[in-house]
Amino acid sequence: MRKMKKLAALILTASMAAAALAGCGGKAADTSATTSTTSAPETTAEAAKAETTKEAAETKGLKVALLLSGAANDMGWCQTAYDGLKVLESDYGCEISYTENLTPDDIEAAFADYAANGYDVVIGHGYEFGDPAVEVAEQYPDTKFIVTEGEVSAENVASYVTKCEEGGYIMGMLAAGLSKSNKVGFVGPIQGASLVKIMNGFEDGAKAVNPNIEVQTAWTGSFTDTALGKEAAQAMIDNGVDVIGHCANESGTGAINAAKEAGVFATGDSYDQNALAPQTVVSSSVYHIPNVIETAFQSVENGTFEGGIYNLGMREDAVSIAPYHDLDAEIPQELKDEIERTISAITEGQFTVPLDTKVR
């Protein structure tokens, strides 16, 4: 199961870990919600089948739904969860459904609708799904509710928090090490604690490489407005910034576009975003939400599900950085070595990225 054995084992040994602050998910998109349902293909339990096929047969009939605040194909935060949902369909034979572009006012009803229609597991992707999940969970005790980046728990509600600040820290190191102007910038969407911790991680990482680096920041107020992201990044570029970071979903795509047009580097978030601008996006902070979702689902499948709050980072294979792709030669070897040493220190428990959720 790829990295799942390691991830699951670490979660079990750290069961009921201390609650983290709110996560990396965003607020709702401006478009109307849409729902899509897919039935998994038929499977058989023949002895010669591979392990994943056997598991798919054993869990055939489990229904899993996913709630998203943005588009499932955003090449960012929402798509990480959608990819995880597709793993449950392909590897476990689950019947899946998802609703995207949910507004805050629609979340509770969406949870209730899936639970009332017999879904075994309903996943809310982002901290904003936490309170609605708890509200609905009491009415549907036989349904398991999973919230990524949540800070809530109940008997049938579990939150899985990604240590996004770790990825932000490494992206900050990379940005500072590449900057020639001694100025880097970071574009965020809203001042939620889960997003502030990424921005602050970026700043801390940058200053770990260069204590004198200037870190310019901006909040667009939107996860989905690419124009606002581009405008914020362009203002920084006009002010001398030559590396742009972000944690702003589609708004962050606008920031990458500004960097591309200006001929400066950018770092991606949530997903390997190099494909958006191969000569611009030098690396990305990648959140392995498919791993997290699979681990959470396995606890339902094998009967070990417990309500609680679980914290997952690089050490648990929940966070990593994307390859440097064709820009590898642009990065000084000394910087690459320093980044690798830092990642090793994090994964070996020798260094903890500071968790700071206060706006600076």
Question: What are the residue ranges of the model-derived segments?
Answer:
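Bacterial Sec-dependent N-terminal signal peptides
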Residues: M1-I11
